[in-house]
A protein has these predicted regions:
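Short beta-strand elements
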Residues: 16-17, 155-159, 224-233
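Intrinsically disordered, low-complexity polar/charged tails and linkers
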Residues: 1-24
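Flexible, glycine/charged-enriched surface loops at secondary-structure junctions
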Residues: 52-59, 90-92, 129-135, 190, ...
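Small-residue-enriched alpha-helical segments and adjacent helix-cap loops
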Residues: 2, 24-173, 200
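Long C-terminal interaction/binding lobes of large macromolecular proteins
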Residues: 285-309
Length: 309
């Protein structure tokens, strides 16, 4: 019979016990769930050789090889490592990075896969040894359709468009192409001019370039908005939307500041959203508005985690 120490030791390496057995499911993590044919062949071969022949793809886009006996785990790890693949994705640290298909999707406002790769390298790989108060999930979505649910991640990135509207160029068409294209019905024609209801507009970008007279320009910068503190499961919390919007190049720096703030202020076993609620969104916004957290990075990472008194 396996001991709790044995079960815990492999859980930290990406192996979760299968209920009622002494076998485990091992998670293979890639960049935002992108797999090459060779990687898929390797996963299938590992499943047949060391598991029960079944593979499950998780909600965070990892490939989970089912039914690996405890004593075969080292062999499975070595087999996959020889093929450039590794088990992981568990524990109180950065979890597998998820991203939608915004890179190729017609609604994608940003290159989600490219941004996810940067985040994967910097945080999932670069900070894999950093122990955080709790799990830390990062998701990248290409548009407000929210297929990847950015607002339910500890940090969620959502691509949108920083478009503008020039009322002087609006001719008040009876059939306004901008209004017709708007999925949230945020545009209406009032007294011969298009009016945009900002409370309904999601900056999805669908209307960009639709006006033949240029009231909505054909080009609009792609930007990112960032949600922090989202959770789903036994406790639900929609992520708090940060006040600013950011370029894709600025996103990794913001994520790093949020993570350092969480490392410094979060209690052990407290999710980021609970830390934000306890300390306040204004405090987080103020902290990430400067580079102080980055300057103190080494000290913050070296400090022990906070325990509740």
């Amino acid at each position: 019979m396996l001991t709790n120490e044995q079960i815990t030791s492999v859980k930290g390496r990406g192996f979760l016990r299968n209920r009622g057995t002494e076998c485990f499911s091992g998670r293979i993590v890639t960049v935002a769930g992108l797999f090459t044919p060779d990687q898929l062949h390797a996963i299938a071969e590992c499943s047949e050789k060391y598991g029960n022949g079944k593979v499950i793809f998780t909600a965070r886009l990892a490939a989970e090889i089912v039914g690996i006996p405890f004593d075969k785990i080292p062999e499975a790890e070595a087999f996959m490592a020889e093929r450039g693949l590794y088990f992981g994705g568990t524990g109180a640290k950065v979890r597998p990075i998820t991203a939608c298909k915004g890179t190729t999707c017609v609604y994608g406002n940003i290159d989600t896969q490219a941004l996810a790769k940067v985040i994967y390298d910097k945080f999932y790989i670069g900070m894999r040894d950093v122990k955080l108060p709790h799990k830390f999930k990062i998701g990248v979505g290409g548009c407000p359709n929210s297929c990847m649910k950015p607002s339910l991640n500890d940090v969620g990135v959502e691509g949108c468009r920083a478009f503008s509207f020039d009322s002087e160029l609006c001719r008040g068409c009876k059939k306004c192409a901008v209004a017709e294209s708007c999925p949230t019905k945020a545009v209406s024609v009032v007294n011969g001019k298009a009016v945009i209801d900002t409370s309904k507009c999601t900056s999805c970008g669908v209307c960009v370039g639709k006006c033949p007279f240029g009231a909505v320009p054909k080009e609009a910068a792609s930007v990112c908005r960032i949600f922090v503190g989202g959770t789903w499961g036994k406790t639900q919390r929609m992520g708090t939307l940060l006040n600013s919007v950011y370029s894709a190049d600025e996103v990794p720096s913001v994520i790093e500041k949020v993570m350092l703030w969480y490392k410094e202020n979060g209690y052990v076993k407290e999710r980021l959203g609970a830390t934000v609620d306890r300390i306040g969104t204004d405090a987080l916004e103020a902290a990430i508005a400067t580079d102080d957290l980055i300057t103190r990075k080494d000290d913050i990472l070296a400090k022990p985690l906070l325990e509740r008194q």
